[in-house]
């Protein structure tokens, strides 16, 4: 049996005595997409911060390739190959594409104290990596990031993460602020990252998008894992109902039906 690339076992997190996460266990394999589903307040953001090294779990363990790890900082998580791309890509609108791609790891030319940022190398690599993900409209590494569409900014951030060796790619609501065509392109990019052997964790409340790309699904409700299933084991309606609270949603539907009948 293949060892999961990333495994969480019994992870809980408390803040001042309040449980934000309770006993979360998850696995994600290389070349697979785990969709982490949940409504606002479900605990998704806290779980992202634990996996990316911003928070330490109160209890529980994290393993990379079967080996226990203890993240003291986001740098520790990054060194283990975990990259997180947030909703707006973490990009810089007033930078060129090449400069933004290499922030903190700039290629240089020259010698000793006379080293300078190698804009051409940076731009060429950034354009090449973006085009490998299907962003063919970007041909100039000097183009300002602010001129890119939302989907292109997401592609830039994803391409950067993969280029710098991400084995686990956490995407936090990557399609939330995008139109239909832009969202579709981001979903295609997710599948391309999957094909490269990257383990993708797609954090979303959009069930339709999750079902298009996901291999494995977990639903969080109020900090607990409410369900864990594979592709094809649940219908979209079942997942939506679970996320909405099941009985609570049924009660609301009955109440609205009664109001319509009384109108």
What are these regions (language model features)?
Residues 2-263:
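Glycine-rich phosphate-binding loops of nucleotide-dependent enzymes
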């Amino acid at each position: 049996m293949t060892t999961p690339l990333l495994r969480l076992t019994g992870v809980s997190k408390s803040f001042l005595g309040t449980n934000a996460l309770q006993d979360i266990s998850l696995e994600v394999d290389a070349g697979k997409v785990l969709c982490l589903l949940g409504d606002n307040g479900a605990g998704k953001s806290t779980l992202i911060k634990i996996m990316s090294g911003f928070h330490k779990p109160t209890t529980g363990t994290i393993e990379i390739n079967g080996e226990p790890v203890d993240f003291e900082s986001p740098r520790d998580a990054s060194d283990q190959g975990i990259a997180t791309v947030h909703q707006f890509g973490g990009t810089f609108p007033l930078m060129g594409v090449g400069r933004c791609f290499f922030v903190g790891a700039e290629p240089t030319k020259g010698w000793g104290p006379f080293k300078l940022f190698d804009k051409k190398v940076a731009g060429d690599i950034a354009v090449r990596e973006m085009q490998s993900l299907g962003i063919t409209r970007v041909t100039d590494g000097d183009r300002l990031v602010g001129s890119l569409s939302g989907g292109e900014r997401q592609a830039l951030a994803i391409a950067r993460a993969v280029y710098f060796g991400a084995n686990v790619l956490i995407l936090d609501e990557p399609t939330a602020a995008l139109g239909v065509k832009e969202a579709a392109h981001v979903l295609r990019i997710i599948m391309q990252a999957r094909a490269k052997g990257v383990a993708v964790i797609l954090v979303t409340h959009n069930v339709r998008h999750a079902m298009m790309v996901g291999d494995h699904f977990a639903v969080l409700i109020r900090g607990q894992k409410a369900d864990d299933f594979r592709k094809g084991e649940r219908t979209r309606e079942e997942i939506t109902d679970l996320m909405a609270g099941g009985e609570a949603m049924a009660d609301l539907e009955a109440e609205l039906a009664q109001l319509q009948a009384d109108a």
